[in-house]
Amino acid sequence: MSKVRVLIRPKEGILDAQGKAVESALPGLGFEGIEKVRIGRIVELEAESTERVGELCEKLLANPLIEDYEIETIED
């Protein structure tokens, strides 16, 4: 079995409301010097073949109109 990690995040130029909310709260919590926050999600899969993971991302895991994704192979 192969292990794959898919990182999904909003595309550049798309409003990331969660990221903006965290970014706005940081100074009030004493965190200075952090200028840009983007929040996404991580999906980890185990599969016999990873050939169709990109297709899975396009059709189910990510919204290709507003999200980018990156596929990483996880080494044991």
Region spans (language model):
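A general secondary-structure signal for short beta-strands and their flanking turns/coil
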Residues: 1-3, 40
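Short amphipathic alpha-helices in soluble, non-transmembrane regions
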Residues: 19-26, 52-61
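Short, surface-exposed ligand-recognition loops at beta-strand->loop->(often short) alpha-helix junctions
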Residues: 8-17
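Short hydrophobic/aromatic beta-strand micro-patches
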Residues: 7-9, 44-48
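Amphipathic, hydrophobic secondary-structure cores in small proteins
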Residues: 31-44
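Conserved short beta-strand edge segments in small beta-sheet-based binding/regulatory domains
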Residues: 35-36, 63-76
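Positively charged, small/polar-rich N-terminal and surface patches that mediate targeting and assembly
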Residues: 3-5, 66
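A common structural junction motif
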Residues: 26-31, 61-67
